[in-house]
Amino acid sequence: MAEPGFFNAMLIGALIFGYVLGSIPFGLILTRLAGLGDVRAIGSGNIGATNVLRTGNKKLAAATLILDALKGTAAALIAAHFGQNAAIAAGFGAFIGHLFPVWIGFKGGKGVATYLGVLIGLAWAGALVFAAAWIVTALLTRYSSLSALVASLVVPIALYSRGNQALAALFAIMTVIVFIKHRANISRLLNGTESKIGAKG
């Protein structure tokens, strides 16, 4: 049986590993490599896929979305070799790293893609629930932000209903953070000024 000190050190190591991986700012890197400048200087100033899309390059936005998700998936799957607790720590670290990357002044994305990536790595069936909730909400409302919020809200409930309290707790915390990061979007939704999917400008 592992000593408590070793176990704690392993979890801290997994958290740090996840954070470093999650803090890679793919949106910023890809837009610069494509000669589109600093994505932080346009739109919302966010480094995530939605703001990258505002450059007009859909392929680059898709690549950003996939890579931001893979950060979470890779962190969780690699750390899973040391147990579920390590996987949870690494997944959470990747999520936090994406939100607050040390390399660019702790100003990162809103976390939805990495949230989904961590979910794929820890509970792929939960990712299907997320996708279904996102698609249904998007079809009904055409609000990308609302779709992400609803999907993230449904996930911990679904995980808890299947008896996975540890993962439900993790994603409940992550959902709260996602809501906090989307507070400007929530305000615009309430005011009726949030942009819809496919809207111009």
UniProtKB/Swiss-Prot annotation:
MF terms (GO), sorted A to Z: acyl-phosphate glycerol-3-phosphate acyltransferase activity
UniProt keyword annotation of Lipid biosynthesis present: yes
Subcellular location, record wording: Cell inner membrane
Membrane topology: Multi-pass membrane protein
EC number per UniProt: 2.3.1.275
Alphabetized UniProt keyword annotations: Cell inner membrane, Cell membrane, Lipid biosynthesis, Lipid metabolism, Membrane, Phospholipid biosynthesis, Phospholipid metabolism, Transferase, Transmembrane, Transmembrane helix
Reactions catalysed according to its record: an acyl phosphate + sn-glycerol 3-phosphate = a 1-acyl-sn-glycero-3-phosphate + phosphate
Transmembrane segments: 10-30, 60-80, 86-106, 116-136, 139-159, 166-186
Leading EC class: transferase
Domain of life: Bacteria
Biological processes annotated in GO: phospholipid biosynthetic process
Pathway: Lipid metabolism; phospholipid metabolism
GO CC field: plasma membrane
InterPro entries, per database record: G3P_acylTferase_PlsY (IPR003811)
SMART domains registered for this protein in UniProt: G3P_acyltransf
Function: Catalyzes the transfer of an acyl group from acyl-phosphate (acyl-PO(4)) to glycerol-3-phosphate (G3P) to form lysophosphatidic acid (LPA). This enzyme utilizes acyl-phosphate as fatty acyl donor, but not acyl-CoA or acyl-ACP.
Subunit description: Probably interacts with PlsX.
Protein family (similarity comment): Belongs to the PlsY family.
The protein's name: Glycerol-3-phosphate acyltransferase
Organism encoding this protein: Brucella ovis (strain ATCC 25840 / 63/290 / NCTC 10512)
